[in-house]
Every structure is written in structure tokens, then in C-alpha cells.
Amino acid sequence: MSAKLTLESIAKTFAETSIFAILFLIIVILNLGLLVFLAYQYRVYKKKQRANLTKQTYNNDYGQIVNLKQQNGAKIKELANLKDQLSELGQKFNTTLSEIINKPLVNVIDEYLDEQFKQAANFREAELNAVLDSNDQKTVFHKRLFNKFHFGVDKLANINVKNPLNLCWVDSASFTVIESDFRKLNGVGGINKKLLIEKLRIEDIIFTNIDKKYYEVQILSDSPVKVQKTVLTIRNILINDYVDNEKIESYAREANGYFNDHCKLIGKQVLERLNIFEISPKLHKFFGLLAFRYSFGQNVLSHCLETGFLTAYLALLVNFKPDVALKCGLYHDIGKADDENGKKNHTVTGAKIGDEFYFENDVKYTIANHHNKNVDNVYCRLTQIGDKLSAGRLGARSDSSVLFSQLKQELKQIVEETLAQFKTTILLGQSGRRLVIWLETNQHNNIIDNQQLTDLATTIKSKIVQNNITNRFPIKVVLRYNFEHSFDTKDKN
């Protein structure tokens, strides 16, 4: 009986305990579920919070970028304005310097113009005032100004202007070296000479033994630029105690650098001598390059300087600004600096240079229009007269009439020596830069082919380059070969 009660009590106790255990497990599971739900909700909350923070940060960064862009745009505009102001200040500074440094401009110009020019250009004061006070508006002022004066370009055709070009800037194609320097330049078997010819792209380098100690070096090239580069390269080679093939090749490669520095020096010295203090070395280079450019036998830098002096003096006579007129004359052919072969339009090229260096409007207009017939700018008209005077005066296009005569005589002698077996007619252009040779023969046995004609042309060119008179300026030689060759279509009986 007692055992039965014990089992029942145990069963009852177990049943009660199981119920409590099940309830406990349910409570635990519910709590865990609640924790998981809370954890999930917290994670979702944090994710939204991070997303909002990222969006806010992005919006802030974007706003800062927009603000920086606006600020930079404003600063760029400020810099552009400052650049323009600096350019204006530079021009004013140059003008002020030209007034207070060295001699007054009128005195500088007086040094280069002779009395003949001043007398020919001496206007009558009463007529000058009459033109300036005229109310006739039908004719443009500058046309009335020059058409009504007793002043014609033809009266000034024979004026003399001192050549302001410093000849030491442009080295001669011929010079003398000692024997040790000759060996250094020639090298073993002429290897150094070949390297120089190849790298500098010149025709030849000729060494002539004067006596046992000295050699004459002659650079053959129709390009003054190549001659100058070769001279500068040789000069750098000779100042070294020892050179080998690699060093010579290195010097030849650096020839452009030597030449550019040389041009900058020329331009800087010329402009500063005229109280024009430009900031940019690039403009110095452009201006210095003109020392190695020729137009119909006339050195372009020398021509620009002459034109500048003449234009400035004319401006003084008619009460215009001589400093502006001087720049118009100096820079009117600046476009030729960037055109070694003469194939570009130098007025267009020059106008671009004027824009690049912020030239005054009158100067830019003159550069672009000095070859035009119809101009509406007084400084451009003055420059046209100065340009014509410089280019058209006696001997300007070949240094002198005497040199032109010598040039013609030397060319005639070269042609006659080379083409002795032909009847020849030669024509040398007035500028001295174009030589036309006609070959004539009626003899069948004197007929030559294209290769022989090419060989004759090469021989003539070599002699022209080697001659001290004919090699001063580039000359275009044209060979025209005309012959008569007759034959019968049927044999005569």
C-alpha cells in the first residue's frame, strides 16, 4: 500500500515538475526570441543611422566641392585680370624707363640717321599746321598727312643709315685654328668631321693647310643658322682638352641649345640698348633669330632696326609717339624669326607672336597689315614708309652696290669656268638672290643627260659656297638647258 502511494506521489511530482520545466523552456525561448528581435531592430536602426550619416557627409563634401569650384573660378578670373594689369604695368614701366634711362629716344635715333635724311624730311611748319588743322574729313588723316607734304619716299631713296647690327654676333663661316685643334676636329680618318657634318646637317667642312702650324676651317652651308650652330659646337669642342666621338656627338646634339642661348643674348642686348626691357626670354630669342634671317640679301635684324629708327624719327616729325613707332618698326618683321625657309606668311605668324607677348594694339596692327595697301593706322603707315626706305635704299639688299657688282662678277667667272664648253647666258636678279643660267648648244656631241646636268649644278653650288663673296647670302641657282637636235625621218638618196 505504501509502495503504491510512493509511486503515485513520484508520478505526481514528476508531472508537476515537467509542467514547470516546459513553462520555463517556453519562457526562455520567448526571451531569446525577444533578444533576437531587439538585436535585429538595433542593427536596422544602426544601418539607417550610418546611411543617413554617409548621405549627410556626401552632401557636405559635394557642397564643399561646389564652393571650392566657385572660389577657384573667381580666383582664375582674378589671376587673368592681374595678368592683364601686369602687362599694362610692364608697358608703362618700359615707357618710363625709355624716358629716364640712358639717352632720350630722339638722341638715340639721331645717332643712326644722317643729315641727308633729316634735310629731306624737313617739313614746312606752316604746311604741317594747315594739314593738322584741316576740317576736310573726306580723306583719312594719315593719307592727307603724307600726300600733301613736300616729302616723298623717292627723295630719301639714297639715304645712309649706320648699320646697327653688331657683326660679332654672327660668326663667319671661315676661321683659322692651330694644328692641334685641326686634329681634334678632324679626328682619325676624318671620323669627327663626318660626325659633325651628319649631326649638324651641313654640306661640308673644308680644312686648308696655311702653313705647318695653322689650318683654315671653312663651313659649307647655305643656311646661316646651321653655320652658327656649327661654329658654336666647334667652339665648345675646342675648349676641352680631350674629346672623343661620344663627346663630339653630344656637343652636336646640344647645338640647338647653344644656338637658342646665343639668340636670346642677341635679342636682349639689342632691345635693352634701345631702352626696351622685355620680360620674356622667348621674345629675346625670336628677335635674336632675325640676325640669321635674310630677305633678298638684306639681314632682317639690321632691316628691322633701320625701319624702327626711321619710323620713330618720322613719328617725331609729325608729333606722334616715337616709342610706339620704334616698336612698330622693330617688330614689323618679327614673324620671319619662325620661318627659316620663307614659306610661311610672316604677317600672320608675327601677329600671333604679338598676341602671345601682349604687344600694344598699334604694334600688333602694324605687324599684321604693313604689306596692305589700305590701312587706317598712322603708325602702320609710318612703318610702311620706313620699311620701304630701309629696303629700297641704294645697296641695302646686297650690303652695297659695290658688293652687288662684285657678286655678279664672281658668279659670272664661276659659271664660265664650270661651263666653258657651253654657250651660256646668265641673269642675276636685282636682289642678288636668284641666278638663272641658260645653257645652249647646237652640237650633237655636246648633248648632256640629267645626271651630267646634276653634276654641273653640284659643282657650281660648291664653288659658290666656297667663294668669300658669293657665300655671304643664300642664292637660288636655276639651270635651263636648251638644245636643238634635228634628224630626218627618211634617208636621202
From Swiss-Prot:
It comes from the Bacteria. One of its GO terms (biological process) is mRNA catabolic process. The keyword Iron-sulfur does not apply. The chain crosses the membrane at residues 19-39. GO terms for cellular component: plasma membrane. Belongs to the RNase Y family. Endoribonuclease that initiates mRNA decay. This is Ribonuclease Y. It comes from Mycoplasma pneumoniae (strain ATCC 29342 / M129 / Subtype 1). The lineage of its organism: Bacteria, Bacillati, Mycoplasmatota, Mycoplasmoidales, Mycoplasmoidaceae.
